[in-house]
Every structure is written in structure tokens, then in C-alpha cells.
């Protein structure tokens, strides 16, 4: 697809002539809103986080659209696409997104991607050397199921508060392909009152020194598989299972 085709999903002249990547003025934001308003129902939202750059690209793959198969929007900063703009996509019914991360991103802990309270199902496919998942799903109030695949690499992940305050979360599925080396997990599953089962048998915790409040407030937790845990270096277990049903 050519660079100038980015906004042709929206048929208006304003959208077709819109400058790419300029989200700092009201006109551009309005055009993006119009594009999202006109997206077909079946979409694939792809967020690419570029190494050492704040600029981010969002590819929206419009499966039911014949003439133009997708749009590319350059975004800086990420806040301009989530929040109310993504809410617009989900007003008709609950959508199922596949999010792809490509490239290491140091800023992931500062960009909570799922502020959208309408999304209830999210699937994450990670095929990069991304390491920092701090607060990635924090305060996702309506998400019920999360599935993570292809977490397999030599690096160690930072997962502090990764699922913190997911008050509706019932299921977290780490795919069989996952091999997770974790370094930080403070408050990782804290305040997930509806979460019943967590399977962490793919986790290597030999580098973890602090597991405090990891399962705080998991009041419905019935099963926790942590058979692979190595806690020889852990020095802080404070509140790890506080207010937890286990």
C-alpha cells in the first residue's frame, strides 16, 4: 500500500487529504475519529512499537473491505489512539482484537494500551524481544479473558503490576509455547477478585528477589500452579497471598 492511501477508508475529501502522523491538532483527531467510525466490523488492530523511537504505527486490517485492505496511521504519542478513539471502534458490539508487538520498547510501562472499558477479550501475540510488561493491563476493568503466546526468549521480563486491578478478569492463558523468564512480579496479579485459576508452570523465577503482594486480593483464586517456581533468591514475600482465597 502506498503512503498516500493511509486514510482512504474514510471516503470524505478531508480524510483522503489528511496529513499522516499529525495528531497534535483538532482537525487531525477529528479525521481519525471519522475513520474509526466507518470501519467494518471485523478488524485487526496491530500496534508496532519501534525501537528507540516514540513514534508508533497502528495498522488496522479491514478484512471485509475490498478496495483498501488496511490503513496505516503514525501516532505520537500513543495516548491519541487509545482512550476515546478506540472506544469508538467498540460501541456497536464487543470486538476481538489481536495485538502484535514488534521490537523492544522501553516505554511500555508508561503506555497502558487497554484503557478501553468496552473490550472484554484480548489476545496478545508477542514475537519480539520486548521485555517490559510493567502495568501493561493495569486497571482494565472489563476484560474477562487474556491469552498470551510466544513468550519465549532468553531475556528476563519485568511484570510488576501487569494484571493489577483487573476486577473482571476470570482467565489468563499462557500458551504452551511460552517459556517465561521473569525478573520482577510485585503486585503482578493483585486485586483480581474474579480470577480463579493461574497456571504459571512455564515461569522461571530464579532471578526474582521480590514477590510481595503478587496475588493480593485474589479472593476467588482456587488453583495456582507454581510448580516451576525457584525462590532461592527471593528476599521479600510480604503480603504475597494477602486477602487471597488460597
State where each predicted segment sits.
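Short, well-ordered alpha-helices that flank and scaffold nucleotide-derived cofactor binding pockets
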Residues: 242
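Structural signature of tandem-repeat unit edges
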Residues: 43-48, 64-68, 120-128, 142-155, ...
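N-terminal cationic amphipathic segment used for targeting or macromolecule association
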Residues: 13-16, 188, 203, 212, ...
Amino acid at each position: 500500500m502506498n503512503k498516500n492511501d493511509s486514510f482512504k477508508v474514510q471516503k470524505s475529501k478531508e480524510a483522503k487529504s489528511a496529513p499522516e502522523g499529525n495528531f497534535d491538532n483538532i482537525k487531525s483527531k477529528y479525521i481519525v475519529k471519522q475513520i474509526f467510525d466507518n470501519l467494518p466490523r471485523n478488524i485487526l488492530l496491530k500496534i508496532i512499537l519501534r525501537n528507540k523511537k516514540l513514534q508508533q504505527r497502528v495498522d488496522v486490517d479491514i478484512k471485509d473491505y475490498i478496495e483498501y485492505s488496511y490503513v496505516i496511521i503514525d501516532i505520537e504519542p500513543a495516548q491519541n489512539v487509545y482512550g476515546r478513539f478506540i472506544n469508538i471502534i467498540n460501541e456497536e458490539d464487543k470486538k476481538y482484537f489481536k495485538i502484535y508487538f514488534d521490537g523492544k520498547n522501553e516505554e511500555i510501562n508508561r503506555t497502558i494500551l487497554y484503557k478501553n472499558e468496552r473490550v472484554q477479550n484480548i489476545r496478545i501475540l508477542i514475537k519480539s524481544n520486548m521485555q517490559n510488561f510493567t502495568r501493561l493491563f493495569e486497571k482494565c476493568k472489563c476484560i474477562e479473558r487474556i491469552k498470551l503466546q510466544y513468550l519465549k526468549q532468553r531475556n528476563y521480563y519485568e511484570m510488576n503490576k501487569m494484571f493489577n486491578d483487573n476486577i473482571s478478569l476470570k482467565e489468563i492463558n499462557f500458551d504452551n509455547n511460552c517459556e517465561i523468564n521473569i525478573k520482577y512480579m510485585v503486585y503482578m496479579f493483585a486485586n483480581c477478585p474474579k480470577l480463579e485459576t493461574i497456571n504459571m508452570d512455564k515461569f522461571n523465577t530464579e532471578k526474582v528477589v521480590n514477590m510481595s503482594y503478587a496475588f493480593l486480593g485474589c479472593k476467588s483464586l482456587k488453583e495456582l500452579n507454581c510448580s516451576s517456581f525457584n525462590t532461592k533468591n527471593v528476599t521479600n514475600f510480604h503480603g504475597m497471598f494477602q486477602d487471597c482465597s488460597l
